[in-house]
A protein has these predicted regions:
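Beta-strand elements of well-folded, non-transmembrane domains
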Residues: 57, 97, 368-372
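N-terminal "assembly arms/tails" that initiate or stabilize quaternary assembly
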Residues: 1-85, 380
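Short acidic, glycine/tyrosine-flanked loop/strand segments centered on an H-E-D-like triad
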Residues: 76-103, 328-330, 336-341
């Protein structure tokens, strides 16, 4: 915590510098769910804007018996490097006539608390968006009324019938084991959204496993363990869902039959607003080249009938939310240490010179550098699923 600096151009006491810095960091930590499972490293001193992680290869099995008195050839170690450019983030708030330089100020403290939470959410989102790009993915199968399963191959097919189940958890854990992914004290970790956790908690296998077991929480946000996986809940777990297509509506209605690359709709759209978007027409995902106020120009020819419903295709079936549940092995990804390169900046009244001639303004803010990178893609598995709340939750 001593590396969190409070910088001013005025005469803040050493006590206040330390206090505000600690407040910022402590309020950031609860939001940093995605960072707590990363391999951390410090900001490189004199290393420019690039941070580097070393990735070591494995040795082959040494199956050749040793010969007495003969020293065998040793094995070399392969080392590769993963680099990421550092980026700087920050925000501030201007306060009028409120900063007291002689004591801890309640208003500034409250603002610092808010900025600490904002910093945590910002840097956590940067990390989340990076590690959600892993290439290993499983789509939750559709659970039919008779209990049978139907395989799903695309995100846009996922809906409320594609929940995260105990069986799917076991499948994900097995996949990580087969890749020899290291564990966190013998367990893997899954970061999931509360909407997904709701469904999992109602799974009979989860209920049976937690009926008598006393939970031991090791991680912030942990809700329980199943099949060798510890589950950590956060509202910042990734949700994939497209935005509204027309005003506040997530649907459009085909106004007539179509069998080519244009579809006339009944609603009035903002001209050009859907260019570059993806839509679902009769369950087929297609890109939008452009739109008038009543017509979609699509990348491919499609067939639809008057009255067919058109949905956003960036999420799940019928435009619903899809949740990215991250199953993680130890060392899968790396981040910059939060306690380095992060500052809370308090500028008291009178520090701005001619820019504030009447000494009316003070400011409180934060800035920091951050970077995240996947180190071992095979140690991260993303399970994409729907939930009971797929019709309600929005993208984040």
């Amino acid at each position: 915590m001593s590396n969190i600096n409070t910088q001013t151009t005025g005469a803040l006491s050493a006590e206040m510098k330390t206090y505000y810095g600690m407040e910022l960091l402590e309020n950031a930590k609860p939001a940093l769910v995605h960072n707590q499972f990363a391999a951390t490293r410090g900001v490189p001193v004199g290393g420019g804007k690039t941070v580097e992680w070393r990735k070591f290869g494995s040795f082959e099995k040494a199956l050749t018996p040793l010969t007495e008195g003969v020293t065998p050839d040793g094995s070399g170690i392969s080392v590769s490097y993963i680099t990421k450019e550092l980026s700087q983030y920050g925000d501030y708030t201007t306060v009028s006539d409120m900063l007291d330089l002689t004591a801890i100020d309640d208003v500034v403290l409250e603002i610092t608390d808010r900025h600490g939470a904002n910093m945590g959410l910002t840097l956590d989102t940067v990390t989340r968006n990076e590690i959600q790009q892993g290439t290993k993915v499983i789509y939750a199968p559709t659970i039919n009324a008779d209990g049978s399963e139907t395989e799903v191959l695309h995100r846009y097919e996922l809906g409320k019938a594609n929940k995260l189940t105990a069986a799917l958890v076991a499948r994900a854990a097995t996949a990580l084991k087969k890749m020899n992914a290291p564990t966190f004290d013998g367990k893997y970790v899954c970061i999931l959204h509360p909407s997904v956790a709701f469904d999992l908690r109602n799974d009979p296998d989860w209920i049976a496993a937690h009926q008598y077991a006393a939970a031991t929480e090791l991680f912030s946000g942990e809700i329980g363990e199943l099949h060798g996986v510890r589950f950590v809940e956060t509202t910042e777990a990734k949700i994939f869902r497209g935005k509204a297509l027309c005003q506040d509506s997530f649907t459009l209605t085909a106004a007539n039959n179509a069998a080519n690359g244009t579809v006339t709709v009944s609603e009035k759209m903002a001209v050009g607003a859907l260019a570059g978007r993806q839509v679902l027409v009769n369950g087929v995902k297609v890109g939008v080249l452009d739109n008038t106020d009543s017509m979609l120009m699509l990348e491919d020819n499609i067939t639809c009938a008057a009255g067919d419903i058109i949905y956003p295709a960036e999420g799940g079936a019928e435009g619903g939310a899809v949740y990215g549940c991250l199953f993680i092995g130890k060392g899968a990804y790396g981040v910059i240490d939060l306690s380095e390169g992060t500052e809370v900046i308090v500028k008291p009244r009178g520090s701005s010179g001619t820019a504030d001639p009447l000494d009316q303004r003070s400011s409180v803010g934060w800035k920091g550098v951050h970077a995240a990178a996947i180190l071992y893609d095979e140690y991260i598995l993303r399970v994409e699923c729907g939930s009971s709340y797929s019709e309600e939750d929005m993208a984040n």
